[in-house]
Curated annotation (Swiss-Prot):
Catalyzes oxygen-dependent 5-hydroxyuridine (ho5U) modification at position 34 in tRNAs. This is tRNA uridine(34) hydroxylase. InterPro entries: Rhodanese-like_dom, Rhodanese-like_dom_sf, Rhodanese_C, TrhO, TRHO_N. SUPFAM superfamilies: Rhodanese/Cell cycle control phosphatase (SSF52821). SMART domains: RHOD. It is an enzyme of class 1 (oxidoreductase). The lineage of its organism: Bacteria, Bacillati, Bacillota, Bacilli, Lactobacillales. It comes from the Bacteria. Keywords: Oxidoreductase, tRNA processing. One of its GO terms (molecular function) is oxidoreductase activity, acting on paired donors, with incorporation or reduction of molecular oxygen.
Amino acid sequence: MAKPIRVLLYYKYVPIENAEQFAADHLAFCKSIGLKGRILVADEGINGTVSGDYETTQKYMDYVHSLPGMEDLWFKIDEEEEQAFKKMFVRYKKEIVHLGLEDNNFDSDINPLETTGAYLSPKEFKDALLDEDTVVLDTRNDYEYDLGHFRGAIRPDIRNFRELPQWVRDHKEEFMDKRVVVYCTGGVRCEKFSGWLVREGYKDVGQLHGGIVTYGKDPEVQGELWDGKLYVFDERIAVDVNHVDPIVVGKDWFDGTPCERYVNCGNPFCNRRILTSEENEDKYLRGCSHECRVHPRNRYVSENDLSQEEVVERLAAIGESLDVTPA
């Protein structure tokens, strides 16, 4: 039996004239049909995830497919029991994917319509994973990798996507002469990053077409060789990919036990995404460090209306005190 809510993940690199007005008009339409989600619009294209019931999402797909240049836009569809978003946002940005090239002296930005890596089907990507002479590079943020990733994929030592070009240049000698294939959630980041690899001089560059989401839905590979869960940027947080032999790879921030539950650090000035159980969240006041646990703006403390005495008691239980520097 079909679930009542559909979640649509999509993007398309296509020139959009007067993109700011396009974004405003798009938001008005989405609100008029009761759609929820988050959409980025830029001169270079559109990138979004939205959710709604069958009728609402069908209206939206029909509307998008009626727009010039978007007739063939590819929607990746998940069925869920509940909405994946609480509100509707459509925002104009300079880019739908910010690789940070111009900000970091990496010359101009990449246009995927002109330069991008070769598309690999799920089966071709699986073959690449099994090929010892192929480098498989995860292009996502560190917390995304930690929740789940392809078996054997390289985890760049970076916090976010914008740091990836510099990391690759720093490790260029390790795989410049090898075949390099990249992957991301739905494909939008890889379109641009694989193009940058081509421009950097890599001769054999591939990308997982449709991203991890498509790989998990493919009837032939069924998500095999993916370990853990897929981090998604909505209320679901994590979704399944491997339907053959799933395992848990995420580890609790505090004790290293298997974990697939993400929270943001209680310190609003840190906000690090950490994997932790509800028990450890309570025990450590949702703080990723001592400094975050005792921060005067700790959200866990305020949300749970903890008194100073209760905070002191919990800190004492883990061998800490209210001092900024732990004993």
